[in-house]
């Protein structure tokens, strides 16, 4: 099953065991969030680690992460931290 949870974020059982990734990639949202938490800027993450992403995609991931923390629901799929 594939669920789009953001403009750039998907949950797809066929990709990375259903973990949140950026649409059209195998880049895990959690990996990008961890880099930001470690102090890297969005520009550094995109330039040095994931050039297939752009600033809008990373900001979408941050917005999605905030929704997860609040216990947001996506259709029939409950998303929880």
Regions found by a protein language model. Give the residues of each.
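Long, charge-rich, low-complexity alpha-helical segments
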Residues: 28-81
């Amino acid at each position: 099953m594939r669920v789009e949870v953001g403009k750039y974020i998907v949950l797809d059982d066929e990709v990375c065991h259903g973990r949140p990734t950026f649409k059209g990639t195998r880049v895990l949202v959690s990996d990008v969030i961890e880099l930001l938490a470690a102090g890297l800027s969005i520009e550094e993450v995109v330039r040095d680690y994931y050039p297939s992403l752009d600033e809008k995609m990373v900001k979408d991931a941050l917005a999605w992460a905030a929704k997860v923390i609040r216990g947001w629901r996506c259709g029939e799929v409950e998303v929880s931290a």
